[in-house]
Amino acid sequence: FSGWDKTLFGFVENATIKNVRLENAVVTGASKIATLALEVRGNSLIENCHATGDVNAVADVGGYAGGLITYLTSGQVINCSANVTTLGMRYIGGLIGLVRIDGVVRDCSASGGAHCVEYDAGGLVGTNSGLIENSHASGRVSRAYYSNAYYDCGGFVGDNSGIIRNCSAKGDVHMYGQNGGGFVGWNKGHIESSYCLGDVHDETDGYGGSASAFCGMNGRDAEGTVYPTNVPGTLINCFATGKTDIRNELNLTGYPA
């Protein structure tokens, strides 16, 4: 199906969805799209739901996409997976585009890959402010060249200000611009007992990019000031085994973990 804000279910609020399998789904359109749900909120539970297919949300307006869910505002997503190639402008995740502070993701996986034109692309989640545990991503993550905004691209999550524990990323990251990492592009939260295996390729011409095997930028903005104020990101018991291949060596940052 295609159009604006397209998913199988639209807004899921204080509801339970279990044991749904979507095979070879093809979703195209503008604004916010995914295979299963547009937004999950309230005391909702999404459990044992799985999807395969393609999602394409490239548009000047919106362009947010998730392999299974676009927004997890609150509630839980447990034991779900997506083998969906996900393409969009911003907030692009192989499983979920954006997880807000009251969202919980456990025992989930994504393998289809996530590709953005502007910012915040991750193999599992594009942007995370909630809690993610025991979850894994194995798809390739990439960000195309874009003249206005280009940052935060990670093998597991693009931008993190939440909590991530016991997670892994295995796909390569190909990027232009700032904050590319094998696991996380920009970390302003807490990441513990997690690892990544993929290589990071930074194609940025000239100074201005930042790339590293695990975390592209940890708790600091491009000017080096702490963000949020006096609350740097934390990395505990994390490691990376991949290589970092950069066009300009000035863009290599110091968070290989």
Give the ranges of each region predicted by the language model.
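Predominantly extracellular beta-rich ligand-binding scaffolds that present long acidic/polar faces
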Residues: 1-257
